[in-house]
A protein has these predicted regions:
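Conserved core positions of repeat-based scaffolds
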Residues: 27-29, 37
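Conserved AAA+ ATPase "SRH/arginine-finger" region at the nucleotide-binding site
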Residues: 1
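Conserved RecA-like ASCE P-loop NTPase motor core of nucleic-acid helicases/translocases
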Residues: 22-26
């Protein structure tokens, strides 16, 4: 509630300027095991403040309902779209200018970059707000710091790889410290290659 009240003036301003907002949550429903924001609860909170202007989509919604909500967002009937990461790819709404990501420390670096890419497709400067709870892990703090420092997808992918590790290339492990005996698959960083091309 406190975070919502702090963001409220921005929401009102964006809506008054006929711009739209994505609000991303990591969970569909409230969980007793995970202390993360749910899309359903956030929808209820935001809808109380902006009645009949808020939509909700997530992976558990029927496709027809989801398509109807997205169509209402496209024609600007809905001003704020509360969603899980189902909007991560394949969504293009140039009028959506702001994205708010709840529990941003829960997401990976590349995923945050993908989500952030849902806005900034129009002619106005976009806004990305990363919300998180206190006591961030060192790794989570580093991810958010990187995201704040660059919009370059190649640099973000490289940093993400460095943070998560390569995992097991021939196995099932998708992250972890690399264990190469003869060669490092990333001996030259993308940044160095770009600098070499420029020179």
């Amino acid at each position: 509630e406190k975070k919502l009240n702090e963001i409220l003036p921005l929401l009102k301003k964006e809506i008054s300027l006929e711009r739209q907002i994505f609000w991303i949550c990591p969970l569909i429903d409230v969980s007793s095991n995970l202390n993360y924001t749910s899309a359903k609860k956030k929808f209820e909170q935001v809808n109380r403040l902006f009645p009949n202007q808020v939509g909700l989509i997530h992976g558990g919604i029927d496709k027809k309902i989801k398509d109807k909500v997205l169509q209402d967002f496209l024609i600007k009937k809905i001003k704020i779209l509360v969603s899980t990461t189902v909007i991560e790819v394949g969504i293009d709404f140039p009028n959506a200018n702001t994205i708010i990501i709840e529990d941003s420390n829960k997401f990976g670096l590349s995923q945050l970059h993908q989500l952030r890419g849902r806005v900034g497709r129009g002619n106005t400067e976009s806004i990305c707000i990363l919300l998180y709870k206190n006591n961030l892990s060192k790794n989570a703090r580093e991810r958010l710091k990187i995201l704040k420092s660059t919009n370059d997808g190649f640099i973000i992918a490289e940093k993400d790889l460095q943070l998560r590790g390569f995992g097991d290339i021939l196995g099932f492990q998708q992250s972890g410290i690399k264990n190469f005996k003869f060669a490092d698959p990333l001996p030259v960083s993308y940044t160095h290659l770009r600098a070499h091309e420029t020179a």
